[in-house]
Amino acid sequence: MTTQFSVAGIELELFRYPASQESNLQAWDAADEHLINTLVEGGQTAVPTAIINDSFGALSCALSRLTPDWPLNVETDARTSFLGAEQNHHRNQLSMENLTWFTSRDALPSDLALVLMKLPKNLTYFAHQLMRLSQVLPAGSKVLVGAKAKSINTSLLEVFAKYLGPASASLAWKKTRVITCISDGKPRALPKEITWDIPEFNLHISNLSNVFAANKLDIGARIMLDNLPQGDFKTIVDLGCGNGVLGLRAAQLYPNADIHFIDDSEMAVASAKANWANNQLPAETGHFHWDDCMTHLPDGVEPDLVLCNPPFHQGEAITDHIAWQMFLDARRRLKNGGILHIVGNRHLAYHVKLQRLFKNCTTVASNGKFVILQAQK
């Protein structure tokens, strides 16, 4: 893994978050480099700029290195993106006084003159981001979006035209392109939340745009809901909660328990919180945390059950370090005798990790693709 970022005369040392993770993945990609080269070669001056979907701060660090007082408005839905950018600014001795942070639900500033974006994997979320920009960008504003060349097609350019303005793609460089979109100045209404029901559990679900499995139960959650453990649990963590469906069902099954919902996505945590209220569950027993796994879970919380449907993607990258951190955090925070109850694809071989960490692992249920595993501290 290389950590030396060297583009257009800008030298940085960049790490993924956390820096201690063992990974051959680097903290930026060629699309980041292409965006920076495009700005520098075009002689871009330091105007109020939005940076959106900057995974670990490569773009904000590069512009801060180029011009320390460049006014940057950084939007992210991922807690690890914020923490990664903070880590890399400190590591490179860059001030963060020129940065203002936004989630994807916060109101954007009205003085933006330039936008730099990375194309996210979730195109529904991307359309939502374009609609947000349409509400604040005046006609003629420039939006530059870096992406893999293979991800850019006529349909994607039509998404730009529908939600923000006309767009065209650059020539390919290192298998990436930069899309230039010019705002047409016409505000678009933001999409309504997606809502759906799970009648067999009497649950009503709503999702914001960057939440996994937007309008139905994913297969892993389905098998998990059918195989939750029996017991008199008092403190439960829904780790990587998404829309919160596992924790909501847990609240029905274990009515005396406090349920803690944790996700890296701010939209996921907001969706889980809304679903808790919409399903008329008691406000005092639902707790919601936008966090990197259980890193900042309050010290007094000692779960006796952790429910987990681990992701194996971080943005475009396929990685198992998130699952590994979830399992490590569960072992660290569970009370003695507490249970980690997970679902995963068979091919991911999570049983090996759990056996290594907990010295025990039981198969609770399985089908052709998924397996439910349980380990006890």
From Swiss-Prot:
Keyword Transmembrane helix among UniProt keywords: no
GO molecular function: 23S rRNA (guanine(1835)-N(2))-methyltransferase activity; nucleic acid binding
Record SUPFAM superfamilies: S-adenosyl-L-methionine-dependent methyltransferases
Primary localization class, coarse: cytoplasm
EC number(s) stated in the UniProt entry for this protein: 2.1.1.174
InterPro entries in the record: DNA_methylase_N6_adenine_CS, rRNA_m2G-MeTrfase_RlmG, RsmC/RlmG, SAM-dependent_MTases_sf, Small_mtfrase_dom
Enzyme class: transferase
Domain of life: Bacteria
Reactions catalysed according to its record: guanosine(1835) in 23S rRNA + S-adenosyl-L-methionine = N(2)-methylguanosine(1835) in 23S rRNA + S-adenosyl-L-homocysteine + H(+)
GO cellular component: cytoplasm
Keywords: Cytoplasm, Methyltransferase, rRNA processing, S-adenosyl-L-methionine, Transferase
Subcellular location field: Cytoplasm
Record keyword Metal-binding present: no
Extent of the signal sequence: none
Role description: Specifically methylates the guanine in position 1835 (m2G1835) of 23S rRNA.
Family: Belongs to the methyltransferase superfamily. RlmG family.
Protein name, entry field: Ribosomal RNA large subunit methyltransferase G
Higher taxonomy: Bacteria, Pseudomonadati, Pseudomonadota, Gammaproteobacteria, Alteromonadales
Gene giving rise to this polypeptide: rlmG
